[in-house]
Regions:
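Alpha-helical DNA-contacting segments of helix-turn-helix folds
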Residues: 52, 59-66
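Hydrophobic/aromatic-rich alpha-helical bundle segments in the mid-to-C-terminal region
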Residues: 111-115, 119, 133-180, 184
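Basic, helix-initiating cap at the start of DNA-binding domains
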Residues: 1-27, 34-43, 56-57
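Key DNA-contact positions within bacterial/archaeal DNA-binding proteins
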Residues: 46
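Amphipathic alpha-helical segments used for helix-helix packing
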Residues: 88-115
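Hydrophobic alpha-helical connector segments
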Residues: 61, 68-95, 144-151, 170
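Amphipathic, non-transmembrane alpha-helical scaffold segments
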Residues: 9, 17, 63, 67, ...
């Protein structure tokens, strides 16, 4: 049997994840049957589950990919870049984002599983804010955990607004965010 290149394997994995995102977005986790995944991805269940052992692993892979993407944006473009990126996300991305949030609410073990799969993501975010604080960019009269919660609340609210078709004034929102977190 010929050896398959790493590029081919990565392209096939990306194809599966993209099709899975569309399926989860359209039908939710429960409604994303294996048959629907096969139809949307254009591959057999054997091909799909050769890359991911089950539907749950496929869903978690999407969540981990999104978490990595968020961290890359946060590290390279900062909080402004992250919030701007949220306003540009596809409807399918937003639908999966909220499906994950719904599942986090009903399945507390999911957060532990996500942290176990990607322990460096939370640490990298904390380190970034610590660095910003040391550089005098983030206020020091409020604990970092509160700042993280604040930014997450803004990001989640912005994602919800965009997903229902609202177009918030992002520059005004960013000004409010910075009023709340920037060093005085």
């Amino acid at each position: 049997m010929p050896k398959v290149s790493e590029e081919h394997l990565q392209a096939r994995r990306a194809q599966i994840l993209e099709g899975a995102r569309r399926t989860f977005a359209a039908h939710g986790y429960e409604g994303a049957t294996v048959r629907r995944l096969e139809d949307e991805i254009g591959l057999s269940r054997g091909a799909i589950f050769n890359y991911f052992p089950d539907k749950w692993s496929l869903f978690l892979a999407l969540a981990a990919e999104d978490q990595h993407g968020f961290m890359r944006v946060l590290e390279t473009e900062g909080i402004d870049g992250l919030l701007r990126r949220l306003t540009q996300e596809s409807p399918d991305w937003l639908a999966v984002y909220f499906e994950l949030a719904r599942r986090l609410r009903t399945n507390p073990e999911l957060m532990e599983e996500l942290q176990r799969r990607n322990p460096e993501a939370s640490r990298r975010g904390d380190e970034l804010l610590e660095t910003m604080r040391r550089e005098g960019k983030v206020r020091d009269d409020v604990d970092l955990e509160s700042i993280i919660v604040f930014v997450n609340l803004i990001a989640n609210g912005l994602a919800l607004a965009v997903s229902i078709g609202l177009q918030p004034d992002l520059d005004a929102l960013l000004q409010l965010v910075h009023t709340g977190i920037d060093a005085q």
